[in-house]
Amino acid sequence: MSSAVPPSHAIILAGGRGTRFWPRSRTRSPKQLLNIVGQKTMLEQTYERLTPLFPGSHIWVVTHREQARAVSRQLRQVPSRHILTEPVGRNTAAAIGLAAVHLLKQERGQDALMAVLPADHFIGKPARYRRIVRAALKAAAQPGALVVLGIPPTRPETGYGYIERARHDKPRQSADRDRAYAIRRFAEKPSLELARKYVASGRYLWNAGMFFWRVSTFLENLERYLPKTHAALMRIAERIGTSRYAAALQREYSHLENISIDYALLEPASRDPKHARVFVIPAAIDWSDVGSWAAVYELLAKRPGANVSTGRALALDAAGNLISSPSKFVAAVGVSNLVIVETSDALLVCSRERAQDVGRVVKWLEQHRLQKLL
């Protein structure tokens, strides 16, 4: 990194379950640990995007303890003490907080910068992405700054949250490449009609879940807006590096508030300019959150209506299907717009437009205690 910014660390959030990618995504091998798009896993791709920016000693991963061994196998370059395990999932505020207190204690990193990044997103323009990450870290080095990357919308999407830039900000000029804009507000996932208005206004961006700030700035705001979680994390911090750490983590972590960093900190901070400065940098990086099998189809299809297959498959008089068949031969005849995914013990068949509902299958399996399929 440039000498103009403090030491910077990448925090990869890799603790999700990926239930919408059942039956391939399971508790011990969730979406981020699978090669769903490309030959390498989502986690490996994320790590490789970051290595030109951060040395291995400055990359951290937060994951569930059941996934820690698989993470270690995939990222052998990352020091084992940098793979932070959650005893139970408590959403992104807790996960980021755990990383922050480890930086504070292990690296004496109160002034260090954190780049918080999901493990399971697709980015089609990695060079531009790295340039924007550098700009975001530079902006985050300013006192009190909380910086978010926003994706310029390419369609009226109802599945993402939106970020509205402040009205007084002028449209970005070529000389202002990668500039940070003040945020007016964070908007919930909208209706289709409202999403169309957002896109037409030119002021709204998709919230991509990528965040940048100083450790000290984050912890100050966490104490202000989520004081109980902050206090519990500081109790955990006191035990880092001691024989009592595991017990403290187990005891305290399950009591942390189960809330996203957006709701917990960023949204209230954007309404509180007296205490915080919240900014967004537009990032046209060919991004997808790869949120369902339908998103995988969109990324892999070479043209509208094409069939996409991984593994051994045949499509006859068929169109728009995604077939994932790593072991069995699958033939699809006279069908359209389906997702077909087989594993050794399960088969999923659903329409592409209902791919978001695959998570309901996992809920049903949980209710019926079919643990072998989870």
Predicted regions and their residues:
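Conserved N-terminal catalytic core of the sugar/cofactor nucleotidyltransferase
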Residues: 1-12, 20-30, 35-134, 151, ...
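Left-handed beta-helix
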Residues: 1-7, 215-374
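Conserved core of the sugar-phosphate nucleotidyltransferase
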Residues: 123-255, 277, 351-352
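Residue-level signal for inorganic ion chemistry
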Residues: 43, 99, 120, 163, ...
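Residues that recognize and position ribonucleotide moieties
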Residues: 115, 211, 289
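A short acidic, often aromatic-flanked loop/helix-cap motif at beta-alpha or helix-coil junctions
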Residues: 89-94, 155-157, 192-194, 286-288
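Short coil/turn connectors at secondary-structure junctions
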Residues: 6-8, 56-57, 79-80, 109-112, ...
